[in-house]
Every structure is written in structure tokens, then in C-alpha cells.
Amino acid sequence: MSHPDLNKLLELWPHIQEYQDLALKHGINDIFQDNGGKLLQVLLITGLTVLPGREGNDAVDNAGQEYELKSINIDLTKGFSTHHHMNPVIIAKYRQVPWIFAIYRGIAIEAIYRLEPKDLEFYYDKWERKWYSDGHKDINNPKIPVKYVMEHGTKIY
């Protein structure tokens, strides 16, 4: 009744569990949820620590600087997701921290870029103007193009 590949999965499972155990050590509860496996890789490469909870920034460095983290699979899309309810309150929060953008092809990491708040001001200003001109209506997940990140960011990996 089971699929022929079940034995292969069972053979791999101890290694997957080991990966999950490493993720738990770094505050990631599930490598299969919310890009947990990719998040672990980005944290280990950058030396950042995950910030718990769904609100606020995503990670912090040893000096206490917080960061917003984004990842993308460029086989599927060309723009980084931002926030499903973009508004001036969220934009003000985003203006306070650098962003780390991880670019993947499938599950293979290709590059990581860092953008400072000033590097993203073009988008902050554009979103803010749109929010006001649309009658204070939140913007649903505006994207930041991969091309923009690569042209304006500092490649750190």
C-alpha cells in the first residue's frame, strides 16, 4: 500500500531530525514551517539570532542591532514579499532597521544581501504616498524586486 519511496524517506529521516534539532537550538520550532530550514541557514551564515514571536523584527546581531529578514525562491517569483497590511506604522518600523535578503534557487542559497534603511527609502516613500492617496487603505504585500536588491544592496554572501 505504501509508496516505494517510503523506505528512502525513512532512511533520510534521522538526518532530517538532526536538522530540526539544530533549528530548535536556534529558536526555530519547525524547519518545514515559515521557511524555517532556510531561516536557520541564513542565521548561521550571518551570525544573527532569531527574535521570538511573530511581531516586531526577525533577528538581532551580537551588538543588539535588529534586522528584518526576507528570503525568496527565484525559481518561483522575482519580488520579495513585505507585509500584508502595509501602512505608515509598519513603514516607520521598517525605516529603523537594516534588511537581510536571502536569494534561493529552490532550496539552494545563491546570495545574501544587506540593505540599509536609506537603500529602501525609495519603496518606503512610494508605499506611504500610495497609502495616503488611496484613502488610508493598507497595501497588500507590496514587493521589492530581486533586481533592486542586487543593484542597491551589499552582497554579504
Curated annotation (Swiss-Prot):
<keyword id="KW-0680">Restriction system</keyword>
<feature type="binding site">
    <location>
        <position position="68"/>
    </location>
    <ligand>
        <name>Mg(2+) 1</name>
    </ligand>
</feature>
<keyword id="KW-0479">Metal-binding</keyword>
<dbReference type="InterPro" id="IPR015306">
    <property type="entry name" value="Restrct_endonuc_II_PvuII"/>
</dbReference>
<dbReference type="GO" id="GO:0009036">
    <property type="term" value="F:type II site-specific deoxyribonuclease activity"/>
</dbReference>
<comment type="subunit">
    <text>Homodimer.</text>
</comment>
<feature type="binding site">
    <location>
        <position position="58"/>
    </location>
    <ligand>
        <name>Mg(2+) 1</name>
    </ligand>
</feature>
<feature type="binding site">
    <location>
        <position position="58"/>
    </location>
    <ligand>
        <name>Mg(2+) 2</name>
    </ligand>
</feature>
<dbReference type="InterPro" id="IPR038402">
    <property type="entry name" value="PvuII_sf"/>
</dbReference>
<keyword id="KW-0378">Hydrolase</keyword>
<keyword id="KW-0540">Nuclease</keyword>
<dbReference type="GO" id="GO:0009307">
    <property type="term" value="P:DNA restriction-modification system"/>
</dbReference>
<keyword id="KW-0238">DNA-binding</keyword>
<protein>
    <recommendedName>
        <fullName>Type II restriction enzyme PvuII</fullName>
        <ecNumber>3.1.21.4</ecNumber>
    </recommendedName>
</protein>
<keyword id="KW-0255">Endonuclease</keyword>
<dbReference type="InterPro" id="IPR011335">
    <property type="entry name" value="Restrct_endonuc-II-like"/>
</dbReference>
<dbReference type="Pfam" id="PF09225">
    <property type="entry name" value="Endonuc-PvuII"/>
</dbReference>
<dbReference type="GO" id="GO:0003677">
    <property type="term" value="F:DNA binding"/>
</dbReference>
<keyword id="KW-0460">Magnesium</keyword>
<dbReference type="GO" id="GO:0046872">
    <property type="term" value="F:metal ion binding"/>
</dbReference>
